Amino acid sequence: MKKSERITIDVITTSDMHSHFLNGDHGSNIYRAGTYVKTKRKENEHVILLDSGGSLAGSLAAFYYAVVAPYKRHPMIKLMNAMQYDASGISPNEFKFGLSFFSRAVSLSRFPWLSANIEYKRTREPYFSTPYTIKEVEGVKIAIVGLTSDGLMNREHFEMENELQIDKTLVASKRWIRFIHETEMPDFLIVIYHGGINQLNKSANEREQNVNEAEKIMQSLGVIDLLITGHQHQTFIGRDDQTLYVQAGQNAEQLVHVKINFKQRTTSYELEDVESQIVDLNEYKEDEDLLNLTFYDRKT
């Protein structure tokens, strides 16, 4: 098959949805997000859908499905599977109801949950199978690696099970990003970091700065093309040297859409430019297929 002269890859990201799947609940627009994603997939088959984490706790609905009815399949997992998410980051919220709850959610997901610094204590290998995933699009290799804020995990006082630990975010990021560049040689590297950026809080003390280490990750590594952040429930797009950094708010009220454009060389593709925009979902209708999928969940 003849290679295209140009390839555009659409990266769409959400953040901190906190199980707000009741339509009209706290401005949640996950059903409108579903419509937007469907629309973009009709326009371009090369869509990568990501979430920065924080989707399984933080609402009464989340409590119900974790504590009152843990035997039921979690509606957020059903929705994210149906929307064909490609990967999610991991936040401390995922551990709020215990490791067994989150492990079951992971097992029911048709996408990987990524964190390079949540590890087995004995081996220091990633606890959730793989810290990164590779998406190949017509010969263009996109690497996606996950990181969880160790400062946020410690601040929230979540008890880690005996068999796992949280490594320093910067230590793990250096280890795994170097490994990915040396072994996978990606054309574009995306980091999903469930933590924030300190420039949003000029009065941040040292403890808060250790929670939000996005700047340190960008400045100490310098080989990241797109950094997806979370936790702060803010919506923004910025740039630090070669790294585009974004955050997609909360509850799918908005999302961030990044267009990655490659042009063909003799035997490979070269990154041409990256476009980005914040998308307000209020103008989109709710996806009827997704509403039908959670009809009985929303009636519980």
Question: What are the residue ranges of the model-derived segments?
Answer:
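Acidic, glycine-rich low-complexity/disordered segments
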Residues: 88, 298-300
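Acidic, metal/ion-coordinating pockets
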Residues: 1-289
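Phosphate-proximal small/polar/acidic motifs at interfaces that engage nucleotide phosphates
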Residues: 290-298
